[in-house]
């Protein structure tokens, strides 16, 4: 699956324009999702030097990702361009309608349930 993950408030504590502290176990569960073969796209409002700060943070904390603010190459080909909206199977964002679960373990378990439904 393609999993789009917000940065500020989701991977880190909200602290824009600075980079906040890593949320507990975000790195552990993002690495686990990556190791299971999921593509990770960082979907953030950060751009320019602020996007660079997020990328530096992710690399410094060994948090894997496929792209930042860019769609997967096969989707760019399918749509003939890299549209502004990130296309994903799952979106993890602190601003979602129902709110973000309290822990990354809960987030991970929800993604697993969605993935199982796709396989069936």
Question: For each predicted feature, which ranges?
Answer:
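C-terminal cap/substrate-recognition subdomain and adjoining C-terminal extension
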Residues: 51-120
């Amino acid at each position: 699956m393609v999993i789009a993950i917000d940065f500020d408030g989701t991977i880190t504590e909200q602290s824009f324009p600075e980079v906040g502290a890593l949320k507990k176990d975000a790195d552990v569960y993002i690495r686990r999702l990556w190791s299971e073969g999921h593509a990770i796209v960082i979907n953030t409002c950060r751009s320019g030097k602020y996007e660079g700060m997020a990328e530096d943070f992710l690399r410094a904390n060994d948090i894997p990702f496929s792209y930042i603010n860019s769609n997967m190459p096969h989707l760019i080909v399918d749509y003939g361009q890299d549209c502004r909206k990130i296309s994903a199977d799952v979106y993890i964002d602190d601003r979602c309608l129902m709110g973000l679960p309290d822990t990354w373990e809960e987030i991970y378990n929800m993604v697993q349930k969605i993935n199982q439904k796709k396989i069936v």
